[in-house]
Amino acid sequence: MIAKPLIGLVPLLLVACATTPPAGPTVKVTPLGTHAGELCNRDRAMIFEDPTGVRVLYDAGTSVLGGNDARLGAIHVVLLSHAHGDHMGDQRLTALEAGTCQSPTLATAAPNTTSAEIAASKNAGLVMINQMANFLGKRVEAIKGQPTPACPVGAAGDDHTVPFAASCLAGNNLGGTRTFKTANAAKGVEITIVPASHDSSVNRALLSEAERRNLEPDNLTLPLGPPSGYVVRFTNGLVMYLTGDTALHADMKNVVADFHKPNAMVLNLGQSAITNASGAWIADDVIRPATVIISHPNEAASVDGKPRPGSRTAEMSAMMHSRVVLALSGRTMEFDGQGRCLAGCS
């Protein structure tokens, strides 16, 4: 038998390579830190923009200027993982690049917080554990001079159309899901509150004088419900797990990995909650995402946009097998529906 030449196969291979389908619409993720192009000590804030235009702010914290920060743009939803001041925003950045990456120059944002200032300025919905939503709703009321209403809902009772006409409350409990869509979109962004293992007490400086007097004799703070993370399901298929501040816990496997199946995650560092070994294990053995975004470093984590040698961030990144990217301030990353970073990731 004489073998036939495979000449005709080459053009077919070339055609197959040339017609690989494009990645499709992407979710844009933009960190808002204290120093452009770096991941710094106090950096927390992150904006997620769905292909349909829904824009979500996660943990405004202290690396923003407040409600008038020009980097924000439109914000439809404000997320808050827990009540600590570095997430709620008991301080604000005095100016972009003020101070150093390790020690940025901050000023008080009490009693209103940066989260409330942004929600008030942007007419955003407060999407978080009920107690925190109610607390921030009163701060929004103080800013705007009128009570903060519940967010209008659609026929399903847990769906919302953005933009809202005014700041509003969309609090929920652990496990609760709300959907946010633009008027002409077929689908919306689904946001589910998931467990975290941490503390969620509010700084006394943010409380009323009467409440402070009640707590100070026993050196107590006020808990605002359980801490949380989020699973955000975008319309292009990206499923992003936002860990919040948390230690390793069993619900990461049962609730987050097995049920929600995220394909990307934002992992908060911080010595009080997570070790390098446990952080790497969460990424590589529990969640197993296509991409891990490192945030909340509690150190000057980068130099010229690269992990600072000898830092905890560099050490943990080196331990992970997943693709690791730093949440560099002002650098917009783009993610496809499989959790792959297609642009903006070093």
Language model regions located:
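Bacterial N-terminal signal peptides that target proteins for export
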Residues: 1-7
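Active-site metal-binding motif and surrounding structural segment of the metallo-beta-lactamase
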Residues: 53-57, 61-136, 142-148, 155-156, ...
